[in-house]
Amino acid sequence: MALFLIIEPDEDIRRLYAAVVRGLGHEAAFFDRLPIAKPDVVLVEPADSNSLAAALRLQHDNPNLPIVCASVDKPTHEEAQVLRATTYLLKPFSLVELTDALQLALSQRSN
């Protein structure tokens, strides 16, 4: 079972993401309740500067940490280079697209 850390400012969207992660048989945690254990995958809304900063701190500590970005804004070239996300999802997206992105990120984690 993997731990997915959700960094998303909208509470309703956080809950939806958590339900999808749990439906895949994994654990979901929110950044405001950061667990002691290190996450296996991060799901982040990079358009929110606080969320982006948090993801960058986590990635600094673990450069191979898979990151899935889900945003209403298409990333700039600079943002894409800085964050090195496994995948970007443009909102709105389907649950199938979200599930596929999460599974791809999970397959790319370092063990």
Please annotate each region the language model reported.
Residues L5, P66-V68:
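Conserved hydrophobic packing residues within short motifs/helices of P-loop NTPase cores
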Residues I6-A29:
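Two-component/phosphorelay signaling modules centered on CheY-like receiver
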Residues A19-G23, R57, E79:
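Alpha-helical interaction/dimerization surfaces of two-component signaling modules
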Residues L24, P63, L83-R84:
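Short, structured coil segments at secondary-structure junctions
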Residues P35-N62, D73-K74:
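Conserved phosphotransfer microenvironments
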Residues C69-L89:
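Alpha4 helix (beta4-alpha4-beta5 surface) of REC/receiver domains from two-component response regulators
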Residues F93-Q103:
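C-terminal output helix
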Residues Q103-N111:
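The C-terminal output helix
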